[in-house]
């Protein structure tokens, strides 16, 4: 028996991540078996025939929880009345493109998306940004949705966290469930800091269990930071199914209270925690308690951790300053 309904916008819905994602939302994996789902699927005009094919497949699955599908290239229509906006689509970086070019192109997209969310979404809307560079895209969207509380904007480092947990579990020879409190700090980029010092394996320090600091500092950190590029090299295209899985997991973290002794990584607006500039979208260790998202406090860094933390923080400052100079922030 269902007792509530959620309307979800998915941008880039006919893309590889979108295709891997929407069926799992419709089946109840994101919001649970008691929540009916309406899907507002957004694509560019040329991709609408492909999107209609996705909608046909959704129909053919006969998901009991899926009550409505809207396929559109109209951004305002896509955001109409949505409770969740999953901003998956973005322009990928192409050869010869500077990072500032990427920020400018996507900045225009996420400016419009923020405005549409502000003007058309439900009063309780929450926004989960996946399209890269996701931290700064989230910052731009948030900046252009002034009527939406800033604590309802998130960007995804869930995939990075899951990658890191897997690497630690494999190295330690333990089940994936044994690895907890695996924090990704900072930017969803190659500067991110996967904090193995504060991670736990069966409740004990991961560094102590693995007892190979050289592997942790060099192989582990670089493997997590470069995993996306490694997948592209092996598969010929970027992570799609694993990214979709991480979106499911990430949103689930945000709608379900966190078990005792656990935490998860999430990019959210800084309120000055750990010395991060207020207003930056930064990945922190988080917990959801009684429906409220809180940053885990009082974690400590050694010199190695502090250096990595500062590197990713400085990159996010640089991205913010770049988009500000481009007129994409107030």
Swiss-Prot record:
The active site is at residue 188. It is an enzyme of class 1 (oxidoreductase). Substrate binds at residues 93, 99, 132, 163. Its EC number is 1.1.1.37. One of its GO terms (molecular function) is L-malate dehydrogenase (NAD+) activity. Keywords: NAD, Oxidoreductase, Tricarboxylic acid cycle. Pfam families: Ldh_1_C, Ldh_1_N. It comes from the Bacteria. GO terms for biological process: malate metabolic process; tricarboxylic acid cycle. NAD(+) binds at residues 12-18, 106, 113, 130-132. InterPro entries: L-lactate/malate_DH, Lactate/malate_DH_C, Lactate/malate_DH_N, Lactate_DH/Glyco_Ohase_4_C, Malate_DH_AS, Malate_DH_type2, NAD(P)-bd_dom_sf. It catalyses: (S)-malate + NAD(+) = oxaloacetate + NADH + H(+). Belongs to the LDH/MDH superfamily. MDH type 2 family. Catalyzes the reversible oxidation of malate to oxaloacetate. This is Malate dehydrogenase.
